[in-house]
């Protein structure tokens, strides 16, 4: 029983820290499709891949992740905008185990970019909690 309680406490501590510490050996790749018809909309997905030799855990709750827009390719400083989806956050920690070589894909619904952007290049990123993941770019004319 003591061993089980110890493992449970460890799991809870790891879950509580999952948004503030970067898991080891995880690689993030993002893809975004941009539609520029009447309004600029984006659809983004982020794949997290375990490149390490051991199983690790990631948080996969329903809480929305922000898609952020920057004016520099480095994506540093405060973003011009931050768009959250309409997902309902139930505040329940959901953990998924990723073995070596395993991956998980986060799908984000369609998000509308602010309409009043000046002409220029914009660089997208997704705030994954662990890190800011570059997610493509687009230009306005």
Residue ranges and their predicted role:
Residues 13-16:
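C-terminal motif of bacterial Sec signal peptides marking the signal peptidase cleavage site
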Residues 18-20:
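Bacterial signal peptide processing site
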Residues 40-44:
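Structural beta-strand segments of beta-rich domains
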Residues 48-53:
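Asparagine-centered strand-capping/turn motif at beta-strand->loop junctions
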Residues 58-100:
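The feature marks short-to-medium sequence segments in extracytoplasmic or secretory-pathway proteins
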Residues 103-104, 118-128:
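A short tyrosine-centered beta-strand micro-motif
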Residues 106-116:
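Short, hydrophobic beta-strand segments
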Residues 131-141:
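Short beta-strand elements
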């Amino acid at each position: 029983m003591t061993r089980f309680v110890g493992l449970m406490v460890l799991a809870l501590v790891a879950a509580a820290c999952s948004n503030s510490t970067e898991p080891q050996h995880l690689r993030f790749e993002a893809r975004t499709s941009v539609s520029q018809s009447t309004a600029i909309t984006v659809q983004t997905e982020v794949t997290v891949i375990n490149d390490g030799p051991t199983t690790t855990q990631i948080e996969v709750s329903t809480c929305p992740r922000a898609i952020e827009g920057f004016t520099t390719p480095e994506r540093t400083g405060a973003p011009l905008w931050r768009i959250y989806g309409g997902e309902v956050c139930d505040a329940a920690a959901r953990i998924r185990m990723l073995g070596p070589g395993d991956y998980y894909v986060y799908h984000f619904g369609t998000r509308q970019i602010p309409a009043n952007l000046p002409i220029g290049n914009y660089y997208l990123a997704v705030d994954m909690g662990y890190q800011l993941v570059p997610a493509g770019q687009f230009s306005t004319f």
